[in-house]
């Protein structure tokens, strides 16, 4: 995904994590140094391929994510001009692996966590939530995940999903950096021009 973003934003340098766990990166001795040298910190995590719909595991996982985002905000609060892009959690795909009652409880828990993220982003202007759940609804559940990617590279998403996530991250970065694009409007019969000026 970073290769796609780097291709779109030419003047951007990306530092990849030394670890494959969010906790390890946040609590590493190099975290603050990396954060001070960065304008953006991108934290993505997904629940659908890891926890097999166990309510207690999902609850524990979401609590851990809550603590992670709070810790990141705490550790970066004295750093100027850093934006944290944090992925929300997509709702579960189906209830095949659990009871209907348990499935509904899990969905409510995930919705509550996503609301927590939105409220936290309102209080912390440097926290930007990337709505992965909305992307899943747009792309479709069947096209969103690719389990073989998870086993190959711990990336649960399909190629098309990676492209969409890259595009969304790029839009956020461009907006925050105020990157302007030139736009040529060809409107030979003046049907669009009034709306463009408005």
Describe these PLM feature segments.
Residues 1-186, 191-198:
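Extracellular glycan-modifying ectodomains
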